[in-house]
Amino acid sequence: MQFSGTVEIAAPRDRVWSFLMDPNEVGSCGPGVETIEVIDADHFKAKAKVGVGFISARFVVDMTVAERNEPELAVLKAHGQAPGSAVDATANRHLDGPAEGPTTMDWSADVTISGTLASVGARMIEGTANKMIGQTFDCIKAKLEAG
């Protein structure tokens, strides 16, 4: 599944970059995120509960910053496991705009879900994913714009 979008954030680009590269900050905005463990600057682990329709699963997700070009581009790769389900994702975030802001974030994600969770159907998964993505970016935007 492919997801993409653009978010306008009324904040300086370096502050947006710092927030987005801090797993604890981003994790605090992720629906269902229960814990974040920072292993080093490029590796972290999260536990998150995800529900789609009548199925819910608790994922353990390993994430890696695969590429970074501060303060413009970051590519993250993730692999998550839950009993009977798995998810793999690659996400790209590109920041643009004047240094003092506002900042435009273009993002995209390629996500593959397998196992029990995938059995509920792509349409239901996409609807849930779009809702969670929207909640995450609304939270990120609100926190950054609040200062």
Cite the ranges covered by each PLM segment.
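Hydrophobic ligand-binding cavity/cleft-lining segments
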Residues: 1-49, 146
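Hydrophobic/aromatic beta-strand elements that line small-molecule binding cavities or substrate pockets
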Residues: 5-7, 33-34, 60-67, 89-97
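Short, highly charged C-terminal tails/helix-capping segments
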Residues: 138-147
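Intrinsic-disorder/low-complexity, polar/charged segments enriched in Ser/Thr/Lys/Arg/Asp/Glu/Gln
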Residues: 2-6, 43-45, 58-60, 73, ...
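Long amphipathic alpha-helical segments used for membrane anchoring, targeting, substrate engagement
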Residues: 27, 123, 137-139
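Glycine-rich portal/gate segments that line the openings of hydrophobic small-molecule binding cavities
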Residues: 37-82, 135
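Short strand-connecting beta-turns/loops that link adjacent beta-strands
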Residues: 12, 41, 70-71, 98-101
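Beta-strand/loop substructures that line and gate deep hydrophobic ligand-binding cavities in soluble
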Residues: 75-130
